[in-house]
């Protein structure tokens, strides 16, 4: 169904009207970031005027809004009007407000195609205010936040699902791209449930050598391995009574899958080397960015285990589909990093020394236009780089690494269906099976090195971007003497870098150019972490 202005439901099963919306991405009053105005007039064929004094924009938890009220934005409005097919026209008219749309100055008028509006158009007004023109669904209710930042409908859906299943004992499978916040969602499920006072433990199954997976999960008796002089408790026993978060569940070795299935079905585990079962009362929340159904078809993952893990599934939205949340997330991460270097008052509106100009509006606009293949995790890392690179300076400065990042078009999976994904659980992100795969021989040395660097030496993200399997990527890395592995680094080099970077693992990854997971293992082996 489509409204008069061309803005309607995505699919006949939906009854909620989606409306054109203006959301504040940057305002000199930092408290205004996240405010929005639903432009219902456009949906019924009327024009919307945008000026210093209109429309009124309200924060998600407020009923009454305020206009922009910035003296650099003209009182004379520019106009927005529907093109009738889901597109929107911007007409400057007599407005003296300088408008930049997606990085291009608007001289008189500009038409935004339906696909641009769906993606979100970043509007910079007078170099002072940044707005996002997009289409979204006004919320009918607001679920608890659970520590998750943002009010995009896709995130509201996640929050509602967490509220729905938190007090139940069913296993939960969190699905979605890497870096979308699956561990935060897992912790929210734990904190909102009856096990909140018990342990919450997480283990990344992709970061553990297959030979150690069994003992890490289920423990081991003394003498189970050569050189093992003490018993090992294992994550299931350590999380007894609480919640166990199994990240990258798709990387579980086949022999461990059998043991994991038994633990889920019976609540009993067998430590390695033991013939006697132990009780393990845990709630399991698993996470993956893999296509587990494809792994089942290929024999790499057991169907019964998938069925047992997915008592309830929650899809985590990618950041590019939450463009209206980017500025609030950025502000949150910047404040966190500033606090770490004792400059926390820079962006605190309650502090007399608050300096909103330290954060340039144009930078916020550029970050909002980027597609974030690494999602929220990548945005957090960029915030850290920005703060450290601008430490002690009067204004935030963009270093060469961030500048290079923003000039690169984000690599995205090429899906067969290019229509925007619906904001409902029934329409999950495109399966990884839709990616256009390549032969490893098609990947050149320079392309390989650039992809690794652009994805911060994350092998899974790099393999996905290159369109090859992770096994093929490992082989290419092994064949290329230019690329070092964490195992190639000497203890002296690692210890020296550890001291230089103050133990910051992210900074060490940038400096040493190796996988974060593998470097973390080396640090643990050296008892530095």
Tell where the protein language model's regions lie, with residue ranges:
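Structural recognition of the conserved hydrophobic beta-strand(s) that form the central parallel beta-sheet
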Residues: 245-246, 282-288
């Amino acid at each position: 169904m489509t409204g008069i202005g061309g803005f309607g439901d995505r699919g006949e099963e939906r009854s909620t009207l989606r409306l054109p919306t203006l959301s504040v991405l940057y305002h000199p009053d930092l408290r205004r970031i996240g405010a929005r105005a639903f432009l219902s007039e456009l949906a019924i064929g009327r024009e919307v005027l945008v000026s210093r004094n209109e429309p009124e924009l309200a924060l998600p938890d407020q009923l009454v809004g305020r206009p922009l009220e910035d003296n650099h934005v003209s009182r004379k409005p520019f106009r927005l009007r529907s093109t009738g097919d889901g597109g929107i026209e911007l007409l400057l008219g007599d407005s003296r407000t300088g408008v930049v749309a997606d990085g291009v100055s608007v001289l008189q008028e500009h038409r935004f195609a339906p696909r641009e509006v769906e993606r979100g158009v970043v509007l910079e007004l007078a170099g002072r205010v940044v707005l996002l023109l997009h289409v979204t669904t006004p919320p009918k209710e607001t679920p608890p936040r659970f520590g998750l930042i943002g009010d995009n409908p896709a995130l509201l859906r996640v929050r509602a699902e967490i509220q729905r299943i938190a007090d139940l004992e069913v296993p939960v499978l969190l699905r979605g791209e890497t870096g979308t916040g699956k561990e935060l969602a897992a912790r929210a499920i734990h904190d909102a449930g009856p096990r909140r006072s018990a342990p919450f433990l997480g283990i990344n199954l992709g970061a553990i050598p297959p030979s150690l997976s069994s003992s890490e999960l289920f423990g081991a008796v003394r003498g189970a391995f050569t050189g093992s002089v003490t018993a090992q408790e294992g994550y299931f026993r350590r999380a007894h009574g609480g919640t166990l978060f199994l990240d990258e569940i798709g990387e579980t070795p086949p022999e461990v899958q059998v043991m994991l299935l038994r633990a889920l079905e019976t609540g009993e585990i067998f430590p390695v080397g033991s013939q006697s079962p132990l009780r393990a009362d845990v709630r399991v929340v698993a996470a993956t960015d893999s296509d587990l159904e494809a792994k089942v078809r290929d024999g790499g993952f057991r169907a019964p285990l998938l069925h047992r893990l997915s008592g309830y599934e929650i899809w985590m939205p990618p950041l590019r589909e939450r463009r209206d949340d980017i500025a609030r997330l950025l502000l949150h991460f910047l404040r966190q990093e500033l606090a770490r270097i004792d400059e926390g008052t820079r962006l605190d509106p309650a502090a007399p020394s608050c300096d909103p100009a330290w954060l340039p509006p144009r930078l916020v606009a550029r970050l909002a236009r980027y597609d974030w293949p690494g999602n929220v995790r990548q945005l957090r890392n960029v915030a850290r780089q920005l703060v450290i690179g601008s430490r002690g300076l009067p204004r935030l400065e963009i270093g060469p690494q961030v500048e290079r990042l923003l000039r690169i078009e984000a690599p995205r999976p090429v899906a067969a269906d290019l229509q925007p994904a619906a904001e409902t659980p029934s329409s999950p992100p495109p399966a990884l099976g839709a990616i256009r795969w390549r032969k490893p021989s098609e990947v050149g040395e320079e392309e390989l090195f650039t992809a690794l660097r652009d994805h911060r030496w994350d092998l899974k993200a790099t393999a996905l971007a290159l369109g090859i399997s992770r096994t093929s990527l490992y082989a290419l890395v092994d064949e290329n003497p230019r690329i070092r592995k964490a195992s190639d680094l000497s203890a002296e080099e690692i210890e020296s870098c550890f001291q230089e970077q103050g133990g910051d693992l992210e900074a060490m990854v940038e400096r040493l150019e190796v996988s974060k997971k593998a470097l973390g293992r080396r640090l643990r082996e050296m008892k530095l972490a």
